[in-house]
């Protein structure tokens, strides 16, 4: 009886702590996402914030950005196949960073071009349902600006 009670207590404790995307003995995890759920095409919309005074050339309120995220099993982006664009221009720009698969925390660097020291930083959270909420800072810390110095709130959705 004692060993059965101990076993049940251990099972309930493990299930309560389960936060991975994989189930534990049939008990589903929660809070995590998979690389497959993040990989795909994304659309982001920016809105200026008052955190930084925006300089000339900054993105406009409501401006859309698109990205192709190729996420590896450890959450890092495959830099050779991940990219972003500022429509309507067709220029494909490099993207690096990663997504914490345990909780969706996202930190991406959007470069002006390959080998450039001009970059923006996109930080926030991606959900398993295909949404993003966070902020965009131009320039990223230690980088030069891509468009014009500004800080934005960002909403995004996975489009495919």
Which residues are covered by each model-predicted region?
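Sec-dependent signal peptide recognition
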Residues: 2-8
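Detector for intrinsically disordered, low-structure N-terminal pre-sequences
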Residues: 11, 24-26, 70
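C-terminal motif of bacterial Sec signal peptides marking the signal peptidase cleavage site
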Residues: 13-16
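Bacterial signal peptide processing site
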Residues: 18-21
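Short, solvent-exposed loop/hinge segments that bridge or flank secondary-structure elements
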Residues: 32-79, 112-121, 143-158
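Short coil/turn motifs at secondary-structure junctions
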Residues: 49-51, 87, 129, 139-141
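Contiguous, well-ordered beta-strand patches that form the walls/edges
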Residues: 76-133
């Amino acid at each position: 009886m004692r060993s059965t009670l101990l076993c049940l207590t251990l099972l309930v404790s493990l299930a309560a702590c389960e936060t991975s995307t994989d189930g534990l003995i049939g008990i589903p995890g929660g809070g995590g996402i998979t690389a497959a759920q993040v990989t795909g095409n994304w659309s982001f919309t920016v809105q200026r914030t008052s955190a930084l005074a925006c300089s000339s050339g900054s993105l406009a309120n409501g401006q859309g950005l698109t990205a192709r995220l190729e996420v590896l099993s450890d959450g890092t982006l495959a830099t050779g196949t991940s990219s972003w664009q500022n429509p309507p221009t067709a220029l494909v720009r490099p993207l690096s960073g990663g997504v914490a698969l345990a909780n969706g925390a996202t930190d991406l660097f959007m470069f002006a071009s390959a080998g450039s020291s001009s970059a923006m930083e996109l930080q926030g959270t991606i959900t398993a349902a295909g949404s993003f909420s966070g902020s965009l800072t131009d320039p990223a810390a230690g980088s030069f600006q891509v468009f014009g110095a500004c800080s934005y709130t960002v909403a995004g959705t996975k489009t495919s």
